[in-house]
Amino acid sequence: LIAMITQIGYAIGLLFIVPLGDLFQRKKIIIINFSLLILSLLTIAMAPSINVILGASLVTGICSMVPQIFIPIASQFSRPEHKGRNVGIVVSGLLTGILASRVVSGLVGEIFGWREMYYIAAVLMLLCSVVVMKVLPDIQPNFQGKYSELMKSLFSLLKTYPQVRLYPIRAGLCFGSFLTLWSCLAFKMGQAPFHAGSNIIGMLGLCGIAGALSASLV
């Protein structure tokens, strides 16, 4: 249930928060989302009940769309001949982080407990926000208008370009298959006859890192 709520939040963030990068400065959006992530992660770490965890997980999912803001930034600051490679590097980092985090969280959860992993994640988000404030330049928005007009323009793209309708379906099926595999695999490995702990289950993430690293080469 927690994983499902988090993914619902992620979808909400992709649909309603990522487009704000064309309306407001992306640096501010990223820092605000990092701040909310820190609060939500600390809330989960100190949560007294499952309902609090579910609510904070929804916020965590919504704010976890930050990497999707970095992808157009990488494209914007790249030379035309290097755009594909640089975007691929960012995507590789995103996918590698998803898989490597399973390994790290599994080990930390097994040794110290799951709450400690959320404390560590909050500290890492704080470090990331500091790096963004120091390194990322101010990028002026390129859309002049209201948020409602911005959202309408997105739907007009769906009507105008068939590729824009096709690519999200393909990506959604691929990512859905990916999440289904890894989510179910964790439960299966924890049951008979394996009875694996979170550290062993997390190690399975190493199997997919090689494929994630190859994204920059495809």
Residue ranges of predicted features:
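Juxtamembrane intracellular "pre-TM" segments in multi-pass secondary transporters
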Residues: P137-P168
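Helix-loop-helix hairpin linking two adjacent transmembrane segments in secondary transporters
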Residues: V52, I89-K134
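Transmembrane alpha-helices of Major Facilitator/SLC transporters
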Residues: G202-V218
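Short hydrophobic/small-residue motifs within alpha-helical transmembrane segments
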Residues: Q7-I8, L95-T96, G205-A210
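MFS-fold secondary transporters
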Residues: S40-I44, T60, V132
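Cytoplasmic helix-loop-helix junction between adjacent transmembrane helices
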Residues: A56-S92
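Pair of pore-lining "gating" transmembrane helices in MFS-fold secondary transporters
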Residues: L58, T160-T180
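Conserved MFS/SLC helix-loop-helix module at the cytosolic interface between two early adjacent transmembrane helices
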Residues: I12-P48
